[in-house]
């Protein structure tokens, strides 16, 4: 009976794929009548694979083709598949990826009740690459290189939000510490709006040694701290500067610390400069710092806005006033922004489709 059940499940999986794929091949939209004939499949998760969830992470993962994909799990209403769902189906068909229609309750359980938007994929995991594969870029190659270094960020949603900002603002490389850091999980990918799927993340076992090596090569190692305090003995040892006063004149490593404790003592001691975000009011105890992902966005924008080719104030006004006829520069910037990383409301993105 177990074998018969397995055969039936595999047969229905092929039927689902065939029904969807026929419409996709002929440029049609799979309709409600066709979908209503498909058996709702009670899936058994595949071992050693991850369940990537969310419309944009799954779409970008298929486009990037860095993961092996075992199955696409796709839900659709009676109106059929439209927009990105139809695009997902076409891409899966082109790669011969089985497409199954699971029960909503089953998908909720498999995703541990995360916001999956009715789209999931069973995929191979992504791992950070060794930092030496990031290349041995020297200061003479480009004085405006910016690598983001993460020292022990553990919350997957913080990690994902940081990656999203880094990708959007043009960070060249992201380096993490291998120990005490969040891995590249599906939650990180969803929180990054899929940015994790299209950017390389590197890691090192010796973050302090990495920083010292880059400093010897001429890079500026800039750490980050909360509001300066006279009670902190380390404040007098390393210069502290507002991010608004920082001039980006040579290749820079921007180092962000752990959500709770900030930079470790060893890492902070390897920094040549500490950047801070100054508050605009007197703060009560406990509110002297920002969430690490929020701080990352502010710091990165403050630095990256100095990059040559960053749109000027006049160009930004033109983009806002005449979005239909962008200049050559703004068109290039528009193309550089990856699809799926738009600035639309998060609620709208979560509920689309």
Curated annotation (Swiss-Prot):
Name this polypeptide is given: rRNA methyltransferase 1, mitochondrial
Classification lineage: Eukaryota, Metazoa, Chordata, Craniata, Vertebrata
Transit peptide: 1-20
Subcellular location: Mitochondrion matrix
Organism expressing this protein natively: Homo sapiens
Main subcellular location: mitochondrion
Gene3D superfamilies documented for this protein: 3.30.1330.30, 3.40.1280.10
Catalytic activity, as annotated: guanosine(1145) in 16S rRNA + S-adenosyl-L-methionine = 2'-O-methylguanosine(1145) in 16S rRNA + S-adenosyl-L-homocysteine + H(+)
Keyword rRNA processing: yes
SUPFAM superfamilies: alpha/beta knot, L30e-like
Function, in words: S-adenosyl-L-methionine-dependent 2'-O-ribose methyltransferase that catalyzes the formation of 2'-O-methylguanosine at position 1145 (Gm1145) in the 16S mitochondrial large subunit ribosomal RNA (mtLSU rRNA), a universally conserved modification in the peptidyl transferase domain of the mtLSU rRNA.
């Amino acid at each position: 009976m177990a074998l018969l059940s397995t055969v039936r499940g595999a047969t229905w999986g092929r039927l689902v794929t065939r029904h969807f794929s026929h419409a996709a091949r002929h440029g049609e939209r799979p309709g409600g009548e066709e979908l209503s004939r498909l058996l709702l499949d009670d899936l058994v998760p595949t071992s050693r694979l991850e369940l990537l969830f969310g419309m944009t992470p799954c779409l970008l993962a298929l486009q990037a083709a860095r993961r092996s994909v075992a199955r696409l799990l796709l839900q659709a209403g009676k109106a059929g598949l439209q927009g990105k769902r139809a695009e997902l189906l076409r891409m899966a068909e082109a790669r011969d990826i089985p497409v199954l229609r699971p029960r909503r309750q089953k998908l909720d359980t498999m995703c541990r009740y995360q916001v999956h938007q009715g789209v999931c994929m069973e995929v191979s995991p992504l791992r950070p690459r060794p930092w030496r594969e990031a290349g041995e870029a020297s200061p003479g190659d480009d004085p405006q290189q910016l690598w983001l270094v993460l020292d022990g960020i553990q919350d997957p949603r913080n990690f994902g939000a940081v990656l999203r900002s880094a990708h959007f603002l043009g960070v060249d490389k992201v380096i993490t510490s291998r120990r005490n850091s969040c891995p590249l999980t599906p939650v990180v990918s969803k929180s990054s709006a899929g940015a994790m799927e299209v950017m390389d993340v590197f890691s090192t076992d010796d973050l302090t040694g990495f920083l010292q090596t880059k400093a010897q090569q001429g890079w500026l190692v800039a750490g980050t701290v909360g509001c300066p305090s006279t009670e902190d003995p380390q404040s007098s040892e390393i210069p502290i500067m507002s991010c608004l006063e920082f001039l980006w004149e040579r290749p820079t490593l921007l180092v962000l610390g752990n959500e709770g404790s900030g930079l470790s003592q060893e890492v902070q001691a390897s920094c040549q400069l500490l950047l801070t975000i100054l508050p605009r009011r007197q703060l009560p105890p406990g509110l002297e710092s920002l969430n690490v992902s929020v701080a990352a966005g502010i710091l990165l924008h403050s630095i990256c806005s100095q990059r040559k080719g960053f749109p000027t104030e006049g160009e930004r006004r033109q983009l806002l006033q005449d979005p239909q006829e962008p200049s050559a520069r703004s068109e290039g910037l528009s193309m550089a922004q990856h699809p799926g990383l738009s600035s639309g409301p998060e609620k709208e993105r979560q509920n689309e489709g």
